[in-house]
Amino acid sequence: MVSDFGLPTFISATELLLASAVFCLVFWVAGASKPRVPKGLKRLPGPWGWPLLGHVLTLGKNPHVALARLSRRYGDVFQIRLGSTPVVVLSGLDTIKQALVRQGDDFKGRPDLYSFSFVTKGQSMIFGSDSGPVWAARRRLAQNALNSFSVASDPASSSSCYLEEHVSQEAENLISKFQELMAAVGHFDPYRYVVMSVANVICAMCFGRRYDHDDQELLSLVNLNDEFGKVAASGSPADFFLILRYLPNPALDTFKDLNERFYSFTQERVKEHCRSFEKGHIRDITDSLIKHYRVDRLDENANVQVSDEKTVGIVLDLFGAGFDTVTTAISWSLMYLVTKPRIQRKIQEELDAVVGRARRPRFSDRPQLPYLEAVIMETFRHTSFLPFTIPHSTTRDTSLGGFYIPKGRCVFVNQWQNNHDPELWGDPEAFRPERFLTPSGAVDKALTEKVLLFGLGKRKCIGETIGRLEVFLFLATLLQQVEFSVSPGTTVDMTPIYGLTMKHARCEHFQAKLRFEA
């Protein structure tokens, strides 16, 4: 029977027993899926999530902002679910440092995400789930090779090191390109040319060659990177929803294809180097890695062989990480400088006083250019264009802040929240470079260390030092010689677009005027 409202007035005993059984089963499964919390520790707090979906809808278009908002309610350590996968979210500088630095061995893992298996054919040092001796040896090897062809000195050059030589050359070429564009059309989009110049720096270090800006091979590579960023920005639901791996998935297919093309490009460069390798003439990072497994054979610290495939993986990791971050930092900096001309003029006054106009900036000028350094740091902080680190995972049962976290738990580190924490910055929404200067005008080192962009601890980006140097020298060289502006009446859109790295909307109305004749 049904009531006047269309609702049942009673149910049978069989229906009642069946409903009770289903409820008990669901309750039992939910309880059984929760790990047993050791005595003295607490269960992770977190919001209620939708069945099957978890908190996917809660994250919205800006997950970094949504999770920062949740941290205000649940604290610096809480848990959400993506599908049926539990994810621990870390916020707050002290908590993040405790996890990644002081308890670094507990949190140095990577989750075994489905999409990660397609990066470098599963051989990625950055995305791979391995965190043991093999991974540590490869990381040391990559770090040594990177240092050899970046911060190490080049005896045949007047520059202090290979990196300085490459960046100075590319910055000069970039200025020439801007002049050509101004003469031809009177405005330009700086991003498309900055990315080519930065890509050339990492090409020179990894492959020993540079490309012209209209070279189709380099253009193809840069376009691949742009496509990769767009696809990665949408996330990979198949990482958390198993069924999506077996259904038609155009975004995942595109992601696989892009990774295949990146791998093929790098593999071909490595093969070329293998064919022309001479152990007495090490030309670049790729040669350095080939020498390691052909001549040195074993890593002296861990006795780990490095194969051809591993070499391709290391080079691809270094190459991929080597230009997107730097390009994004320079591009955002230029956007701030055209919208805040007072800051641009102040940097140029500092450059005129310290470097002058008779020579080009050097890495050695960096300590004497504190205001430029402060602007770079504020750009890193304000944009937080790397809102999260690559996800971590726990390598063993552990605890943080009194909360129990089991082995294998996926961990998100919200760098954006730290960089916009009012308790840390006071006025986080304001773009104010002076916050990074002491009363005497020096860089406040203690405060700069509170900005999170490159991660911390055992998974910290191995290219951080080089990336910071590149951003500094590109900007110093450009701003010494060029005054940037936008066409009159142009509205510059500074809204961050969420992604693997958060970009701004492209602006095609930049203008550049030489400050003096070379």
Curated annotation (Swiss-Prot):
This is Cytochrome P450 1A1. It catalyses: an organic molecule + reduced [NADPH--hemoprotein reductase] + O2 = an alcohol + oxidized [NADPH--hemoprotein reductase] + H2O + H(+); estrone + reduced [NADPH--hemoprotein reductase] + O2 = 2-hydroxyestrone + oxidized [NADPH--hemoprotein reductase] + H2O + H(+); estrone + reduced [NADPH--hemoprotein reductase] + O2 = 4-hydroxyestrone + oxidized [NADPH--hemoprotein reductase] + H2O + H(+); estrone + reduced [NADPH--hemoprotein reductase] + O2 = 6alpha-hydroxyestrone + oxidized [NADPH--hemoprotein reductase] + H2O + H(+). It comes from the Eukaryota. It holds the Pfam family p450. It is found in: Endoplasmic reticulum membrane; Mitochondrion inner membrane; Microsome membrane; Cytoplasm. Substrate binds at F228. Heme binds at C461. Keywords: Cytoplasm, Endoplasmic reticulum, Glycoprotein, Heme, Iron, Lipid biosynthesis, Lipid metabolism, Lyase, Membrane, Metal-binding, Microsome, Mitochondrion, Mitochondrion inner membrane, Monooxygenase, Oxidoreductase, Steroid biosynthesis. Its main location: endoplasmic reticulum. A cytochrome P450 monooxygenase involved in the metabolism of various endogenous substrates, including fatty acids, steroid hormones and vitamins. Mechanistically, uses molecular oxygen inserting one oxygen atom into a substrate, and reducing the second into a water molecule, with two electrons provided by NADPH via cytochrome P450 reductase (CPR; NADPH-ferrihemoprotein reductase). Catalyzes the hydroxylation of carbon-hydrogen bonds. Interacts with cytosolic chaperones HSP70 and HSP90; this interaction is required for initial targeting to mitochondria. Interacts (via mitochondrial targeting signal) with TOMM40 (via N-terminus); this interaction is required for translocation across the mitochondrial outer membrane. Its EC number is 1.14.14.1, 4.2.1.152. Belongs to the cytochrome P450 family. Residues 33-44 are annotated as: Mitochondrial targeting signal. Gene3D superfamilies: Cytochrome P450. Coiled coil: none annotated. Pathway: Steroid hormone biosynthesis; Lipid metabolism; fatty acid metabolism; Cofactor metabolism; retinol metabolism. Glycans are attached at S71. Induction: By 2,3,7,8-tetrachlorodibenzo-p-dioxin (TCDD) and by 3-methylcholanthrene (3MC). It is a peripheral membrane protein. GO terms for biological process: amine metabolic process; estrogen metabolic process; hormone biosynthetic process; hydrogen peroxide biosynthetic process; lipid hydroxylation; long-chain fatty acid metabolic process; phenol-containing compound metabolic process; progesterone metabolic process. Its cofactor is heme. GO terms for cellular component: endoplasmic reticulum membrane; mitochondrial inner membrane. PANTHER family: CYTOCHROME P450 1A, STEROID 17-ALPHA-HYDROXYLASE/17,20 LYASE.
